[in-house]
């Protein structure tokens, strides 16, 4: 069922988005990738890492042609790779729940353009920690997928079955909810896939452990963890496209 977007863009957030925005050199590619999610997408180098940089390197190494798009711009320092500067545009928002991402989607796409591929990470993490029910998390996630498919009926959406927080904060209740979210994401991916728009669930939790988290941080990646998660996204994308290469 298609869910209409609830128009709610907080003015302060809009100003922050605009102030963080910087123009990247134009990349001649129709493969527009929006990496969407929470602080695990946004990152805050050097305090903690996003998987975006490592995924960008993987995609370059594999010969993909693409352009990261989004209203946010990463101002941290990153080494060049294969002679190219890191494509810093993204749509990660620290602390956001899925409903807050849903509320911002119209603005993000109006400003950044319609993506052909969305990588939706950190789905349900802040929501669960803030006491939202699994049913509400999945309903909001379903609405995000609905909106994206409405603006681009041919969109491909990769969505994570998110990694856990540090084991010391994962109560039995949170573990049970995480399992419910994972199962729900898998079911949503199947139910929301159409003839022209594929939704792919990506296992970013099996094998994840505390060594992938920043020291003294209960939920954010260190460099090793960011690389591990990026490799999961990359493997899922490579498998989905059967080793083919996107062309400009």
Model feature map: region roles:
Residues 2-10:
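Sec-dependent signal peptide recognition
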Residues 16-31, 243-248:
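Bacterial Sec-dependent N-terminal signal peptides
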Residues 29-33, 62-67, 113-119, 152-158, ...:
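Loop/turn elements at helix/coil->beta-strand transitions in domains of secreted/extracellular proteins
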Residues 36, 101, 216-248:
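Histidine-centered active-site loop/cap adjacent to the catalytic His
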Residues 36-40, 44, 69-74, 121-126, ...:
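Active-site-proximal beta-strand/loop segments in catalytic clefts of secreted hydrolases
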Residues 40-139, 179:
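Conserved SGNH/GDSL esterase-like catalytic core that processes O-acyl groups on lipids
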Residues 122-126, 146-180, 203-205:
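Active-site segments of SGNH/GDSL-like serine hydrolases
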Residues 164-203, 223-227:
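Substrate-gating cap/lid alpha-helix
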């Amino acid at each position: 069922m298609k869910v209409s977007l609830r128009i709610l863009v907080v003015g302060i957030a809009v100003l922050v988005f605009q102030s963080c925005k910087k123009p990247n050199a134009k990349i001649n590619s129709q493969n527009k990738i929006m990496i969407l999610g929470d602080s695990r997408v946004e990152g805050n180098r050097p305090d903690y890492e996003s998987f975006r940089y490592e995924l960008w390197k993987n995609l370059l190494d594999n010969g993909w042609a693409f352009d990261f798009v989004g209203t946010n711009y990463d101002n941290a320092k990153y080494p060049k790779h294969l002679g190219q500067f890191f494509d810093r545009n993204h749509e990660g928002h620290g602390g956001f729940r899925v409903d807050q991402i849903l509320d911002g989607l119209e603005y993000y796409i109006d400003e950044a353009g319609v993506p052909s591929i969305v990588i939706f990470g950190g789905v349900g993490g802040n929501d669960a920690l803030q006491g939202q029910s699994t049913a509400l998390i999945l309903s909001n996630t379903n609405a995000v997928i609905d909106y994206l498919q409405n603006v681009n009926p041919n969109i491909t959406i990769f969505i994570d079955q998110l990694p856990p927080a540090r084991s010391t904060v994962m109560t039995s209740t949170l573990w049970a909810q995480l399992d419910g979210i994972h199962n729900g994401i898998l079911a949503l991916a199947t139910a929301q896939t159409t003839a022209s728009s594929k939704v792919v669930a990506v296992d970013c939790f099996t094998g994840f452990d505390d060594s992938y988290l920043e020291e003294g941080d209960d939920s954010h990646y260190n460099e090793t963890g960011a690389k591990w998660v990026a490799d999961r996204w990359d493997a899922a994308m490579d498998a989905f496209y059967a080793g083919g290469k996107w062309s400009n």
